[in-house]
Amino acid sequence: METPVGLRFCPTDEEIVVDYLWPKNSDRDTSHVDRFINTVPVCRLDPWELPCQSRIKLKDVAWCFFRPKENKYGRGDQQMRKTKSGFWKSTGRPKPIMRNRQQIGEKKILMFYTSKESKSDWVIHEYHGFSHNQMMMTYTLCKVMFNGGMREKSSSSPSSSGVSGIEQSRRDSLIPQLVNNSEGSSLHREDPSQFGDVLQEAPIEDAKLTEELVKWLMNDEDDAQIEDAIPIEEWETWLNDIDDAKEKSIMFMHDNRSDYRPPNSLTGVFSDDVSSDDNDSDLLTPKTNSIQTSSTCDSFGSSNHRIDQIKDLQESPTSTINLVSLTQEVSQALITSIDTAEKKKNPYDDAQGTEIGEHKLGQETIKKKRAGFFHRMIQKFVKKIHLCSSISRT
């Protein structure tokens, strides 16, 4: 029997005794109480078989039944409480039920055991009513309760009967519907495991690309091979072309020196910021000395003064000559460095290469390093020319 929405069957202990137990035991017509509570031999059935036989469910996870008394022996009041899977055992002392300071009944608590030491979550609150004639009290009211969750109740029961079986079947019937709906819908969820390979491959590919890029940047063999393929005569021709262009720019500045307007006074000395390795340190000395002894910065000393001091350029042609001879000194420094490098190739190096067994490889390495040094020195020289040109134009 289903109760209307908003109504709950939750009588008190006093109402159970007065309004249900007494009429069930004394009245001839018990239909008014039987319509709500069914009569079942509770202590002969396993607890998971009882929910399906209840006519109404209480507010809690509980079910009410009338149980006829069944004495275990001919004498005494000991009841039959053994089932197929276990037994019901009384725990604690009975709790008296009072009305107007008079005891009208008592409540006993029974626990269901599947063995002597295995206690389950099934509990019975058994109500006994008192009257003047105790021979008339042939029924008790049992409130069967389950203290565990619905999942535990369904797993503890060997058969899927009762309310737990109905609810379990409802859940099982809903699962295929949800699966079918999810498969037919456009919002079907993808399995995240299928993207695991992609997420793992991306960092690996990035690491490989970074490693190859670093190797390519650190590898100077390609540049050295290109530099070795260019003969020294072409380097000298290229330097001469730069000298001609520089002489033209210097002469143009000399002819138009009266139009020069320096925005700010320039001070300081140009420094060589490009670093080279330890193997080229000895080759760097001639170039550095030649530049320091030349008039690279002194030739442009006129840019550090005002317009009235530029007239000194006409009186001192030595500055112009020094400017013109700048590139010639750098070219001479290159030739000197080449001669110095050739002289440093002594028999000791050849003997050492022979002992290692890599004489040819050692010569190629020295040649590549020498060409790389020339290339870096030319780059620094071009940077200085561009810097001087920008200063002269301003």
UniProtKB/Swiss-Prot annotation:
Stretch list, region Disordered: 152-173, 264-300
Pfam families membership: NAM
UniProt GO cellular component terms: nucleus; plasma membrane
GO-annotated molecular function: DNA-binding transcription factor activity; transcription cis-regulatory region binding
Gene: NAC003
Bias-annotated ranges (Polar residues): 286-300
Limits of the NAC domain: 3-147
Residue ranges the UniProt entry marks as DNA-binding: 104-153
Domain text: The NAC domain includes a DNA-binding domain and a dimerization domain.
Principal location class: nucleus
Name by which UniProt lists this protein: NAC domain-containing protein 3
Compartment(s): Nucleus
Compositional bias (Low complexity): 155-165
Keywords: DNA-binding, Nucleus, Transcription, Transcription regulation
